Amino acid sequence: MPQRIPLWMVGVMAGLGVIAILGLFFYGSYAGLGAG
């Protein structure tokens, strides 16, 4: 049987993805306000 990806690893990757997206969003808005 093909080895499946552990559920906890999927959760960690999803969490990191969300944190990265939120970080880029807040950083972009902060940089935009600072440049304005």
UniProtKB/Swiss-Prot annotation:
Keyword hit for Cell inner membrane: yes
This protein's UniProt keywords: Cell inner membrane, Cell membrane, Membrane, Photosynthesis, Photosystem II, Reaction center, Transmembrane, Transmembrane helix
InterPro entries documented for this protein: PSII_PsbJ (IPR002682), PSII_PsbJ_sf (IPR037267)
Subcellular location, principal: membrane
GO CC annotations on file: photosystem II; photosystem II reaction center; plasma membrane
Transmembrane spans: 5-25
SUPFAM superfamilies listed in its UniProt record: Photosystem II reaction center protein J, PsbJ
Matches recorded under Pfam families: PsbJ
Cellular compartment(s): Cell inner membrane
Membrane topology note: Single-pass membrane protein
Known role: One of the components of the core complex of photosystem II (PSII). PSII is a light-driven water:plastoquinone oxidoreductase that uses light energy to abstract electrons from H(2)O, generating O(2) and a proton gradient subsequently used for ATP formation. It consists of a core antenna complex that captures photons, and an electron transfer chain that converts photonic excitation into a charge separation.
Listed PANTHER family: PHOTOSYSTEM II REACTION CENTER PROTEIN J
Assembly description: PSII is composed of 1 copy each of membrane proteins PsbA, PsbB, PsbC, PsbD, PsbE, PsbF, PsbH, PsbI, PsbJ, PsbK, PsbL, PsbM, PsbT, PsbX, Psb30/Ycf12, peripheral proteins PsbO, CyanoQ (PsbQ), PsbU, PsbV and a large number of cofactors. It forms dimeric complexes.
Similarity comment text for this entry: Belongs to the PsbJ family.
UniProt-listed HAMAP family: PSII_PsbJ (MF_01305)
Entry protein name: Photosystem II reaction center protein J
Source species of the chain: Gloeobacter violaceus (strain ATCC 29082 / PCC 7421)
Lineage: Bacteria, Bacillati, Cyanobacteriota, Cyanophyceae, Gloeobacterales
Name of the encoding gene: psbJ
